[in-house]
Every structure is written in structure tokens, then in C-alpha cells.
Design a protein with these regions (language model features):
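Transmembrane alpha-helix termini and helix-breaking/packing motifs in multi-pass membrane transporters
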Residues: 143-154
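Predominantly cytoplasmic-facing regulatory/coupling regions of multi-pass membrane proteins
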Residues: 1-96, 152-264, 292, 297, ...
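Extended non-transmembrane interhelical loops and adjacent amphipathic helices
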Residues: 80, 92-119, 203
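Transmembrane alpha-helix interface/packing and boundary motifs in multi-pass membrane proteins
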Residues: 97-106, 241, 257-276
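Interfacial segments of multi-pass membrane proteins
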Residues: 117-123, 255, 277-292
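Membrane-interface alpha-helices at helix entry/exit sites of multi-pass transporters
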Residues: 88-90, 108-109, 122-135, 288-299
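Selective transmembrane-helix segments that form parts of the transport pathway or gating/packing helices
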Residues: 135-140, 301-305
């Protein structure tokens, strides 16, 4: 398949319009989450239980923040090996800015990184290719860690088959030139200029993904993923210990990744609600009371998902301010 020129990303005004919609979606999601928490608190004492572990939650921010640095290092390394010079701090701000919209459907809001990395001379399809590779390798890491909690989720085998099947199809399609050539011919016959351009962009991204499918890139990505998700799992275990819950540490290490996997497969934006429910049900199977399980689930999500959104929003403001300074 020939490599056509990259499609236009759209004007700045269009980007701002889309970002406004995505930001409004995340804001409404946050408001709904708070409303549900207030409702759940009646009879469960969730807030009072959270107040008992606020110190553990504050300390948890440190390892969670370290995971962001590891993830950015992977992103920076993947782009650098493709010949791009990414300034460390502006690149970090652009990468973290994607977390502001991580609670959008399929984490698609994280693709706003295209906006910031395009300013550094990185084509949109390359950013998308790295994003897909990062997500796919993280999926394999999460799946591996989830096996530690197999005893509390009898149907894990089905999830394993689904995830492995998806990743194999994704990587197989990217690595199979004949399939991409066939898809390229089909895309040229699609009705509508917009649909053809979208399909063309997707195929170029698949070509970019193919360039990531070497042993060194896969090994580096998996190593970084295991460090990042291992730290996140350890944070969950520490929160359980802080609440005095007696759990097998090895099983507890697998609960949060497995809950994240279930949340992702639920197709609920950010896995909000479904991830928490999965944590509660798994802890219930281990003999933990529902009020305690709810408190742990909420605490874990506050220091992971919602903390990431706050960090992302701050990084987005920094990135936007920096771009205006350059324009001025």
C-alpha cells in the first residue's frame, strides 16, 4: 500500500469546538459520579470510611505520578526511535493533557495529544499509531496481572480469549501487507469524501502501528506497562491494607487490573461505575463487607482515574498557555 500524504487535522477552531464538547461530557460525568457517591453514602458511610484513609490516598499520589513518568518515557522513546525530536517538558505536558479526557468513550479523548504533538512536527497518524500500540500492549499487561485474581472471577477464561483475540487481529492486520492493500482498495470505493479520508487515515495509522511491531519495541513497551500497572496495583493493595482489610496480597494485586479490564469491556466511558462494581463484587467474594468494598473502590478510583483527569486538565492549561506564548 502506498503511503499517501497525511490528512489535514482540521482548524484550531474545529479542535476547540470538539474539545469543548468532550470537556462538557467529562464535567457531566464527574457531576454524576459525585451525585451517585452522595446517594451511596447513605447507609454505607462511604465518606466516613474514606476519611480514615486520606493519608494513604495522599501518599498514593506519589507512585501514581511515577507511573505517568514511565508511560511518558515509553511514548517519548517510541517517537524518538522514529526520528522525532520531542522536547521533554513540552512533550510531557502534551502527553499528560490527554488524561484530561481519559473518561471519554474508548479513551478517545486522549487522542487530543495529536493537537499538541502536531506542533512538534509529529504527523497525526504517527501519534495515533503509537497510541494504539500503547493501548494494545497495556491491554496485554493488564490481562497478565488479572490472572492473579482468577480465583474470584470464574469466567476470566472468556475475557482472556476475547482480549487475546482482539490483540492478535489488531497486530495481525497491521503486520499483513496483503490485508492492508485489500482494505486500501475497498476504502477508495467508500461513499462520501469524509468517509474515504477517515478510512485513509486509519490505514496510514495501521502502517505506523506496523513499524512498532518489532521485538525491541514490544519488549520495552511491555516492561514499562508492567512497572506502571504493577505500581497501580500496589496502590490498590495499600489502600486495602489501610482500611484493615485482610486479603491475600497476590490475589489483591490482580483485583484492580481485572476490574479495569471489565470496565473497558463494558464500553462505559472511563469504566465509570462498572470498574467500581467489579471491585465490590470481587471483594465480596473474598468476604469483605459491601460498605468496606465500596469505600476501597471509590478510594482507588479517586487516586487513579479522577487524579489523572485533574493532572490532565492542569497539563492542558500549561500546553495551551505555552502555545499562545509561542504564537505571541
Amino acid at each position: 500500500m502506498d503511503s499517501p500524504s497525511p490528512p489535514s487535522i482540521g482548524s484550531a477552531a474545529r479542535w476547540r469546538h470538539r474539545l469543548d464538547y468532550l470537556a462538557a461530557f467529562v464535567f457531566l460525568l464527574c457531576a454524576g459520579y459525585i451525585a451517585v457517591l452522595v446517594w451511596v453514602d447513605h447507609g454505607n458511610g462511604t465518606f466516613s470510611r474514606l476519611s480514615e484513609v486520606w493519608q494513604s490516598m495522599a501518599l498514593a499520589i506519589v507512585p501514581v505520578s511515577i507511573t505517568y513518568l514511565f508511560r511518558y518515557w515509553r511514548w517519548h522513546w517510541l517517537l524518538r526511535r522514529k526520528g522525532h525530536h520531542v522536547p521533554v517538558l513540552p512533550g510531557l505536558a502534551g502527553y499528560l493533557a490527554g488524561f484530561a479526557l481519559t473518561a471519554t468513550p474508548g479513551k478517545a479523548g486522549e487522542l487530543m495529544r495529536i493537537r499538541y504533538f502536531a506542533r512538534m512536527g509529529i504527523p497525526a497518524e504517527r501519534t495515533l499509531g503509537v497510541f494504539i500500540f500503547e493501548r494494545a500492549s497495556d491491554l496485554l499487561v493488564i490481562l497478565s496481572l488479572s490472572l492473579l485474581a482468577a480465583s474470584v472471577f470464574p469466567t476470566l477464561g472468556t475475557l482472556v480469549a476475547l482480549v487475546l483475540g482482539f490483540v492478535c487481529v489488531l497486530f495481525g492486520a497491521a503486520a499483513w501487507p496483503a490485508l492492508l492493500n485489500s482494505l486500501s482498495r475497498v476504502s477508495e470505493r467508500l461513499p462520501g469524501r469524509w468517509l474515504r479520508r477517515l478510512a485513509r487515515f486509519g490505514l496510514i495509522s495501521a502502517l505506523e502501528l506496523r513499524s512498532c511491531l518489532d521485538l525491541r519495541a514490544f519488549g520495552q513497551s511491555m516492561f514499562t506497562g508492567f512497572v506502571a500497572w504493577g505500581l497501580t496495583s500496589a496502590v490498590f493493595v495499600s489502600l486495602c491494607a489501610g482500611m484493615g482489610l485482610q486479603l491475600n496480597p497476590m490475589v489483591a494485586l490482580g483485583i484492580y487490573p481485572l476490574a479495569m479490564l471489565i470496565g473497558a469491556l463494558s464500553f462505559v466511558p472511563g469504566g465509570v461505575g462498572t470498574t467500581e462494581l467489579a471491585i465490590v463484587l470481587m471483594l465480596n467474594r473474598l468476604g469483605i463487607s459491601t460498605p468496606d468494598a465500596i469505600a476501597v473502590a471509590v478510594a482507588a478510583r479517586l487516586v487513579t482515574l479522577w487524579y489523572a483527569i485533574v493532572v490532565g486538565a492542569a497539563a492542558m492549561l500549561i500546553a495551551e498557555f505555552a502555545s499562545r506564548e509561542e504564537a505571541g
